[in-house]
Amino acid sequence: GNSDVPVGQYTQKILAYYQLDEATLAAAGVITYGSNVKEVTTQITEGSVDAGVVYCTDAYSASLTPVDEATREMCGQVIYPAAVLKAAPNAEAAKEFLAYLQTDKAMTVFEGVGFSAV
């Protein structure tokens, strides 16, 4: 992904971890960029790229089998934050939803699609 999207930022960290020069790889046509993780997932699914960096959950959703996983050492912890907005028109419902996200039932759903608790 592009550097302005999270998956692109994680990819840059992975390349740096392996001491690979992104600019050199891009100039050589070895790497290409997607505007978001769904675009990269589609490129992999269609076979228009040899490999791509996507979230395991996106790979799972697209029936792709990851060949490797990035570690926290490579790119840090991937976190999906959630919050109730100050101006939320349905703040009480949003609070209830956030409370649900912290239940064992929700965790079972998350784990079923490849997420883990932080």
Regions found by a protein language model. Name each.
Residues 1-118:
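Exported/periplasmic ABC-transporter solute-binding proteins
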